[in-house]
Amino acid sequence: MAKPILRIGSRKNTRSGSRKNVRRIPKGIIHVQASFNNTIVTVTDVRGRVISWSSAGTCGFRGTRRGTPFAAQTAAGNAIRAVVDQGMQRAEVRIKGPGLGRDAALRAIRRSGILLSFVRDVTPMPHNGCRPPKKRRV
């Protein structure tokens, strides 16, 4: 019968405390990706490291309700609530995509109390690249 291999150290005791370290972030970048089906809001520091993120799907919206402006507003509020607690005062906003949640997410960001240095539209525009999807026939 084979003997079990004894482990010297236990993995449970290696890490004490939580992994997330709370650091003060005075300035950041808020990325809003608004597609027709969902809206994803990501808050990063100026170097691009993700601090907080939220989407309409993680806020509990399912199906076609994920693409609504109200879902985008809720997602933006959830993502920003965490960074306001960490002391973010100024941010720049980068909006990407053609979705309905663009304006609603921007409105929620303005209402949060963070000063916006500028709002930039970074939607990728093709120089006649891929063929677009066919028109819907309902």
From Swiss-Prot:
Domain of life: Eukaryota
GO molecular function per UniProt: rRNA binding; structural constituent of ribosome
Entry keyword set: Chloroplast, Plastid, Ribonucleoprotein, Ribosomal protein, RNA-binding, rRNA-binding
GO cellular component, as recorded: chloroplast; ribonucleoprotein complex; ribosome
Keyword Transcription: no
Gene3D superfamilies according to UniProt: Ribosomal protein S11
Gene Ontology biological process terms in this record: translation
Compartment annotation: Plastid, Chloroplast
Biased composition (Basic residues): 9-22
Region (Disordered): 1-22
Family: Belongs to the universal ribosomal protein uS11 family.
Subunit structure of this chain's protein: Part of the 30S ribosomal subunit.
Protein name, UniProt field: Small ribosomal subunit protein uS11c
Gene this protein is translated from: rps11
